Amino acid sequence: MATIKDVAKMAGVSTTTVSHVINKTRFVAAETEKLVLQAIQELNYSPSAVARSLKVNTTKSIGMIVTSSEAPYFAEIIHAVEEHCYRQGYSLFLCNTQNNVEKIKNHLEMLIKKRVDGILVMCAEYTQDSLDLLANFTSLPLVVMDWGPDNKHTDIIQDHSFEGGYLATKYLIDHGHKDIGIIAGELTKTTAKTRYEGFIKAMNEAGLKINPDWVMEGFFEPEDGYECMNKILAQDTLPTAVFCCNDVMALGAISAIGEKGLRVPEDISIIGYDNIHASRFYSPPLTTIHQSKSRLGARAVTLLFERINEKSEERAVIEMHPELVIRKSVKSRL
Protein backbone atom coordinates (compact mmCIF):
# COMPACT_ATOMS: atom_id res chain seq x y z
CA MET A 1 0.00 0.00 0.00
CA ALA A 2 1.42 3.35 -1.07
CA THR A 3 2.37 5.94 1.54
CA ILE A 4 2.64 9.72 1.43
CA LYS A 5 6.41 9.27 1.18
CA ASP A 6 5.97 7.21 -2.01
CA VAL A 7 3.83 9.97 -3.51
CA ALA A 8 6.37 12.63 -2.56
CA LYS A 9 9.23 10.60 -4.07
CA MET A 10 7.41 10.01 -7.37
CA ALA A 11 6.37 13.67 -7.66
CA GLY A 12 9.80 14.95 -6.62
CA VAL A 13 8.45 17.05 -3.75
CA SER A 14 8.34 16.96 0.04
CA THR A 15 5.71 15.13 2.06
CA THR A 16 4.62 18.54 3.39
CA THR A 17 3.80 19.68 -0.14
CA VAL A 18 1.80 16.50 -0.77
CA SER A 19 -0.14 17.17 2.44
CA HIS A 20 -0.94 20.73 1.36
CA VAL A 21 -2.21 19.49 -2.02
CA ILE A 22 -4.44 16.89 -0.41
CA ASN A 23 -5.83 19.13 2.33
CA LYS A 24 -5.77 22.39 0.33
CA THR A 25 -4.14 24.10 3.30
CA ARG A 26 -1.65 26.24 1.35
CA PHE A 27 -1.12 27.53 -2.16
CA VAL A 28 0.84 25.10 -4.35
CA ALA A 29 1.96 25.94 -7.88
CA ALA A 30 -0.30 24.46 -10.55
CA GLU A 31 2.48 22.40 -12.15
CA THR A 32 3.55 20.98 -8.78
CA GLU A 33 -0.05 20.19 -7.86
CA LYS A 34 -0.47 18.37 -11.17
CA LEU A 35 2.61 16.21 -10.49
CA VAL A 36 1.34 15.32 -7.01
CA LEU A 37 -2.15 14.42 -8.25
CA GLN A 38 -0.67 12.27 -11.04
CA ALA A 39 1.47 10.41 -8.50
CA ILE A 40 -1.54 9.89 -6.22
CA GLN A 41 -3.51 8.43 -9.13
CA GLU A 42 -0.71 6.18 -10.39
CA LEU A 43 0.04 4.83 -6.91
CA ASN A 44 -3.66 4.59 -6.01
CA TYR A 45 -2.81 6.41 -2.80
CA SER A 46 -5.51 7.04 -0.21
CA PRO A 47 -4.79 9.24 2.82
CA SER A 48 -5.15 7.56 6.21
CA ALA A 49 -8.51 8.50 7.68
CA VAL A 50 -7.18 7.90 11.20
CA ALA A 51 -4.13 10.09 10.65
CA ARG A 52 -6.23 12.89 9.19
CA SER A 53 -8.72 12.65 12.06
CA LEU A 54 -5.91 13.10 14.58
CA LYS A 55 -4.88 16.31 12.82
CA VAL A 56 -8.29 17.88 12.27
CA ASN A 57 -10.03 16.21 15.25
CA THR A 58 -12.90 14.85 13.16
CA THR A 59 -13.55 11.64 11.22
CA LYS A 60 -16.73 12.92 9.50
CA SER A 61 -18.47 9.78 10.74
CA ILE A 62 -21.15 8.95 13.29
CA GLY A 63 -22.31 5.70 14.85
CA MET A 64 -25.90 4.53 15.12
CA ILE A 65 -27.01 1.86 17.59
CA VAL A 66 -30.43 0.32 16.96
CA THR A 67 -32.39 -2.63 18.31
CA SER A 68 -32.72 -4.17 14.85
CA SER A 69 -32.27 -2.78 11.35
CA GLU A 70 -34.54 -5.53 9.96
CA ALA A 71 -37.81 -4.12 11.31
CA PRO A 72 -39.35 -2.06 8.47
CA TYR A 73 -40.17 0.90 10.73
CA PHE A 74 -36.58 1.20 11.98
CA ALA A 75 -35.18 0.46 8.51
CA GLU A 76 -36.99 3.50 7.12
CA ILE A 77 -35.67 5.71 9.93
CA ILE A 78 -32.14 4.39 9.32
CA HIS A 79 -32.49 5.20 5.62
CA ALA A 80 -33.47 8.78 6.48
CA VAL A 81 -30.52 9.06 8.88
CA GLU A 82 -28.07 7.74 6.27
CA GLU A 83 -29.39 10.11 3.60
CA HIS A 84 -29.07 13.09 5.94
CA CYS A 85 -25.53 12.05 6.89
CA TYR A 86 -24.56 11.65 3.24
CA ARG A 87 -25.78 15.13 2.36
CA GLN A 88 -23.65 16.50 5.21
CA GLY A 89 -20.57 14.57 4.06
CA TYR A 90 -20.70 12.06 6.93
CA SER A 91 -20.36 8.27 6.96
CA LEU A 92 -22.57 6.08 9.15
CA PHE A 93 -21.55 3.04 11.23
CA LEU A 94 -24.65 0.93 11.97
CA CYS A 95 -24.77 -1.44 14.96
CA ASN A 96 -27.61 -3.83 15.90
CA THR A 97 -28.11 -4.80 19.55
CA GLN A 98 -31.27 -6.97 19.82
CA ASN A 99 -31.67 -5.21 23.21
CA ASN A 100 -28.59 -7.03 24.54
CA VAL A 101 -26.85 -4.83 27.14
CA GLU A 102 -23.46 -6.46 26.53
CA LYS A 103 -23.74 -5.77 22.79
CA ILE A 104 -24.65 -2.14 23.49
CA LYS A 105 -21.52 -1.81 25.65
CA ASN A 106 -19.28 -3.46 23.04
CA HIS A 107 -20.69 -1.33 20.22
CA LEU A 108 -20.21 1.88 22.21
CA GLU A 109 -16.60 0.98 22.98
CA MET A 110 -15.92 0.05 19.35
CA LEU A 111 -17.40 3.32 18.04
CA ILE A 112 -15.32 5.36 20.48
CA LYS A 113 -12.17 3.52 19.33
CA LYS A 114 -13.08 4.40 15.75
CA ARG A 115 -13.18 8.05 16.84
CA VAL A 116 -16.66 8.74 15.49
CA ASP A 117 -17.76 12.34 15.96
CA GLY A 118 -21.00 11.35 17.70
CA ILE A 119 -23.39 8.48 18.38
CA LEU A 120 -27.11 8.15 17.78
CA VAL A 121 -28.90 5.54 19.89
CA MET A 122 -32.37 4.60 18.72
CA CYS A 123 -34.11 1.69 20.42
CA ALA A 124 -37.80 1.09 21.03
CA GLU A 125 -37.28 0.54 24.76
CA TYR A 126 -34.41 0.68 27.24
CA THR A 127 -33.72 -1.44 30.29
CA GLN A 128 -32.37 0.33 33.37
CA ASP A 129 -29.04 -1.44 32.80
CA SER A 130 -28.88 0.10 29.33
CA LEU A 131 -29.67 3.57 30.65
CA ASP A 132 -27.04 3.28 33.38
CA LEU A 133 -24.52 2.18 30.76
CA LEU A 134 -25.30 5.08 28.41
CA ALA A 135 -24.91 7.53 31.29
CA ASN A 136 -21.24 6.47 31.57
CA PHE A 137 -20.43 7.29 27.94
CA THR A 138 -20.26 11.07 28.00
CA SER A 139 -16.92 11.51 26.25
CA LEU A 140 -18.50 12.45 22.92
CA PRO A 141 -21.82 13.85 21.64
CA LEU A 142 -24.64 11.35 22.16
CA VAL A 143 -28.30 11.54 21.21
CA VAL A 144 -30.47 8.90 22.88
CA MET A 145 -33.97 8.65 21.48
CA ASP A 146 -36.44 7.11 23.91
CA TRP A 147 -40.11 6.21 23.60
CA GLY A 148 -40.35 5.39 27.29
CA PRO A 149 -41.05 7.37 30.45
CA ASP A 150 -39.17 10.58 31.21
CA ASN A 151 -35.55 9.78 32.04
CA LYS A 152 -32.70 12.17 32.82
CA HIS A 153 -30.30 10.30 30.50
CA THR A 154 -32.39 10.45 27.34
CA ASP A 155 -34.00 12.66 24.80
CA ILE A 156 -37.71 12.02 24.40
CA ILE A 157 -39.77 10.99 21.39
CA GLN A 158 -43.37 11.90 22.01
CA ASP A 159 -45.03 9.84 19.29
CA HIS A 160 -48.51 10.23 20.78
CA SER A 161 -49.25 6.52 20.41
CA PHE A 162 -52.32 6.90 22.63
CA GLU A 163 -53.75 9.37 20.12
CA GLY A 164 -52.87 7.01 17.25
CA GLY A 165 -54.56 4.01 18.89
CA TYR A 166 -57.64 6.12 19.54
CA LEU A 167 -57.65 7.46 15.97
CA ALA A 168 -57.45 3.97 14.43
CA THR A 169 -60.22 2.54 16.61
CA LYS A 170 -62.51 5.55 16.18
CA TYR A 171 -62.16 5.25 12.39
CA LEU A 172 -63.48 1.67 12.61
CA ILE A 173 -66.32 2.75 14.91
CA ASP A 174 -67.23 5.67 12.65
CA HIS A 175 -67.58 3.16 9.79
CA GLY A 176 -70.16 1.15 11.68
CA HIS A 177 -67.97 -1.48 13.33
CA LYS A 178 -69.03 -2.54 16.82
CA ASP A 179 -67.32 -5.92 17.16
CA ILE A 180 -63.66 -4.90 17.11
CA GLY A 181 -60.59 -6.92 18.05
CA ILE A 182 -57.01 -5.81 18.59
CA ILE A 183 -53.62 -7.40 17.97
CA ALA A 184 -51.39 -5.38 20.27
CA GLY A 185 -47.67 -5.42 20.86
CA GLU A 186 -46.08 -6.58 24.09
CA LEU A 187 -48.14 -4.67 26.66
CA THR A 188 -45.21 -4.28 29.05
CA LYS A 189 -43.68 -1.96 26.42
CA THR A 190 -44.62 1.71 26.45
CA THR A 191 -45.51 2.04 22.76
CA ALA A 192 -47.74 -1.05 22.71
CA LYS A 193 -49.40 -0.14 26.00
CA THR A 194 -50.33 3.40 24.95
CA ARG A 195 -51.76 2.28 21.59
CA TYR A 196 -53.88 -0.27 23.46
CA GLU A 197 -55.05 2.39 25.90
CA GLY A 198 -56.13 4.55 22.95
CA PHE A 199 -58.14 1.58 21.67
CA ILE A 200 -59.83 1.18 25.07
CA LYS A 201 -60.74 4.87 25.25
CA ALA A 202 -62.40 4.85 21.81
CA MET A 203 -64.36 1.69 22.63
CA ASN A 204 -65.50 3.04 26.00
CA GLU A 205 -66.55 6.38 24.52
CA ALA A 206 -68.72 4.55 21.99
CA GLY A 207 -70.19 2.32 24.70
CA LEU A 208 -68.83 -0.79 23.00
CA LYS A 209 -67.89 -3.96 24.85
CA ILE A 210 -64.33 -5.25 24.53
CA ASN A 211 -64.35 -9.00 23.98
CA PRO A 212 -61.28 -10.46 25.78
CA ASP A 213 -61.21 -13.32 23.25
CA TRP A 214 -60.39 -10.76 20.57
CA VAL A 215 -57.56 -9.07 22.49
CA MET A 216 -54.21 -10.54 21.46
CA GLU A 217 -50.63 -9.67 22.33
CA GLY A 218 -47.66 -10.13 19.99
CA PHE A 219 -44.13 -8.84 19.44
CA PHE A 220 -44.60 -6.58 16.40
CA GLU A 221 -43.56 -9.32 13.93
CA PRO A 222 -45.61 -10.70 10.99
CA GLU A 223 -45.62 -14.16 12.59
CA ASP A 224 -47.35 -12.67 15.62
CA GLY A 225 -50.06 -11.10 13.49
CA TYR A 226 -50.58 -14.43 11.74
CA GLU A 227 -50.74 -16.50 14.93
CA CYS A 228 -52.88 -14.00 16.85
CA MET A 229 -55.33 -13.71 13.96
CA ASN A 230 -55.65 -17.50 13.82
CA LYS A 231 -56.54 -17.50 17.53
CA ILE A 232 -59.24 -14.92 16.89
CA LEU A 233 -60.55 -16.89 13.91
CA ALA A 234 -60.84 -19.98 16.12
CA GLN A 235 -63.50 -18.27 18.26
CA ASP A 236 -67.21 -19.06 17.88
CA THR A 237 -67.99 -15.44 17.02
CA LEU A 238 -65.74 -13.20 14.95
CA PRO A 239 -65.09 -9.46 15.00
CA THR A 240 -65.96 -7.40 11.94
CA ALA A 241 -62.70 -5.47 12.29
CA VAL A 242 -59.28 -5.83 13.90
CA PHE A 243 -56.84 -3.07 14.84
CA CYS A 244 -53.27 -4.34 14.33
CA CYS A 245 -50.82 -2.22 16.28
CA ASN A 246 -48.23 -2.22 13.52
CA ASP A 247 -48.28 -2.83 9.78
CA VAL A 248 -46.19 -6.01 9.73
CA MET A 249 -48.56 -7.72 12.16
CA ALA A 250 -51.39 -6.55 9.89
CA LEU A 251 -49.68 -8.37 7.01
CA GLY A 252 -49.62 -11.60 9.03
CA ALA A 253 -53.27 -11.11 10.01
CA ILE A 254 -54.34 -10.59 6.39
CA SER A 255 -52.51 -13.80 5.42
CA ALA A 256 -54.30 -15.79 8.15
CA ILE A 257 -57.69 -14.43 7.09
CA GLY A 258 -57.06 -15.39 3.46
CA GLU A 259 -56.02 -18.93 4.39
CA LYS A 260 -59.41 -19.43 6.08
CA GLY A 261 -61.21 -18.50 2.88
CA LEU A 262 -62.27 -15.11 4.21
CA ARG A 263 -61.64 -11.74 2.59
CA VAL A 264 -60.34 -8.35 3.70
CA PRO A 265 -62.29 -6.10 4.01
CA GLU A 266 -65.49 -7.87 2.91
CA ASP A 267 -65.50 -10.28 5.88
CA ILE A 268 -63.06 -8.67 8.31
CA SER A 269 -61.65 -5.15 8.10
CA ILE A 270 -58.03 -4.50 9.10
CA ILE A 271 -56.34 -1.26 10.13
CA GLY A 272 -52.60 -1.05 10.82
CA TYR A 273 -50.11 1.36 12.36
CA ASP A 274 -46.84 3.01 11.17
CA ASN A 275 -47.56 3.41 7.42
CA ILE A 276 -44.39 1.58 6.38
CA HIS A 277 -43.51 1.90 2.70
CA ALA A 278 -44.76 -1.60 1.81
CA SER A 279 -48.21 -1.09 3.34
CA ARG A 280 -49.56 0.60 0.22
CA PHE A 281 -48.76 -2.57 -1.74
CA TYR A 282 -50.58 -5.02 0.56
CA SER A 283 -53.60 -6.82 -0.85
CA PRO A 284 -55.72 -4.89 -0.21
CA PRO A 285 -53.72 -1.67 0.33
CA LEU A 286 -53.65 -1.09 4.08
CA THR A 287 -55.51 1.66 5.89
CA THR A 288 -53.10 2.66 8.64
CA ILE A 289 -51.78 5.32 11.00
CA HIS A 290 -48.88 7.35 9.63
CA GLN A 291 -45.77 8.42 11.52
CA SER A 292 -43.10 10.40 9.66
CA LYS A 293 -39.98 8.24 9.68
CA SER A 294 -38.03 10.62 7.44
CA ARG A 295 -38.74 13.63 9.66
CA LEU A 296 -37.77 11.70 12.79
CA GLY A 297 -34.50 10.49 11.25
CA ALA A 298 -33.57 13.93 9.94
CA ARG A 299 -34.43 15.62 13.24
CA ALA A 300 -32.37 13.12 15.25
CA VAL A 301 -29.29 13.62 13.05
CA THR A 302 -29.69 17.40 13.07
CA LEU A 303 -29.79 17.31 16.86
CA LEU A 304 -26.62 15.20 16.94
CA PHE A 305 -24.82 17.60 14.58
CA GLU A 306 -25.83 20.49 16.83
CA ARG A 307 -24.25 18.67 19.76
CA ILE A 308 -21.10 17.95 17.75
CA ASN A 309 -20.71 21.56 16.62
CA GLU A 310 -22.02 23.44 19.65
CA LYS A 311 -21.26 20.94 22.45
CA SER A 312 -24.85 21.29 23.65
CA GLU A 313 -26.13 18.64 26.08
CA GLU A 314 -29.64 19.97 26.64
CA ARG A 315 -32.22 17.21 26.27
CA ALA A 316 -34.61 17.52 23.36
CA VAL A 317 -38.23 16.55 22.81
CA ILE A 318 -39.21 15.36 19.33
CA GLU A 319 -42.96 15.29 18.77
CA MET A 320 -44.63 13.09 16.16
CA HIS A 321 -48.36 13.40 15.68
CA PRO A 322 -50.13 10.40 14.07
CA GLU A 323 -52.24 10.82 10.96
CA LEU A 324 -54.84 8.52 9.41
CA VAL A 325 -54.02 7.12 5.95
CA ILE A 326 -57.15 5.75 4.27
CA ARG A 327 -56.74 2.97 1.72
CA LYS A 328 -58.87 -0.12 1.04
CA SER A 329 -58.67 -2.52 3.99
CA VAL A 330 -61.68 -1.18 5.94
CA LYS A 331 -65.29 -1.76 4.85
CA SER A 332 -68.10 0.53 5.93
CA ARG A 333 -70.81 -1.26 7.96
CA LEU A 334 -73.14 1.74 8.08
Curated annotation (Swiss-Prot):
Keywords: DNA-binding, Purine biosynthesis, Repressor, Transcription, Transcription regulation. Pathway: Purine metabolism; purine nucleotide biosynthesis [regulation]. Pfam families: LacI (PF00356), Peripla_BP_3 (PF13377). Residues 2-56 form the HTH lacI-type domain. GO terms for biological process: negative regulation of DNA-templated transcription; purine nucleotide biosynthetic process. The keyword Transcription applies. One of its GO terms (molecular function) is DNA-binding transcription factor activity. Disulfide bonds: none annotated. Residues 4-23, 48-56 bind DNA. The keyword Mitochondrion does not apply. Hypoxanthine binds at Y73, K189, T191, F220, D274. Is the main repressor of the genes involved in the de novo synthesis of purine nucleotides, regulating purB, purC, purEK, purF, purHD, purL, purMN and guaBA expression. PurR is allosterically activated to bind its cognate DNA by binding the purine corepressors, hypoxanthine or guanine, thereby effecting transcription repression. Homodimer. Consists of two structural and functional domains: an N-terminal DNA-binding domain, approximately the first 60 residues, and a larger C-terminal domain, approximately 280 residues, which imparts the function of corepressor binding and oligomerization. This is HTH-type transcriptional repressor PurR. It comes from Pasteurella multocida (strain Pm70).
